[in-house]
């Protein structure tokens, strides 16, 4: 289930159904994801490096705590990106993409 992507952060483009996880409070991302899910059939939660546990938390809060809304984890993609650090070295940074969608039942 893991794949390796050799891209840099500058090549990424944001589509309307993607949520990028950063350093903001957890519930900020939960709210943003729920707003997107109201308009889209599925949303992809993306994170890199130290933000990966926060992305998993966001997905689990939506699926488990808000089970009355009927959302599920559709897929999980793991990978890595080659990123140039400030000192000029190339480092591999782990990535995760969690797709959350509505239950069809």
Model-derived regions: residue spans:
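Long, charged, low-complexity intrinsically disordered regions
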Residues: 1-42, 50-105
């Amino acid at each position: 289930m893991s794949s390796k992507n050799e891209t840099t952060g500058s090549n990424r483009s944001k589509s309307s159904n993607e949520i990028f996880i950063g350093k903001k409070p957890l519930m900020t991302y939960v709210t943003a994801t729920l707003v997107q899910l109201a308009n889209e059939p599925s949303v992809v939660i993306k994170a890199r490096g130290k933000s990966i546990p926060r992305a998993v938390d966001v997905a689990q809060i939506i699926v488990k705590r808000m089970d009355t809304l009927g959302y599920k984890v559709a897929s999980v993609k793991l990978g890595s990106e080659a990123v140039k650090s400030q000192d000029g070295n190339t480092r591999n940074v782990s990535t995760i993409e969690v797709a959350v969608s509505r239950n069809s039942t």
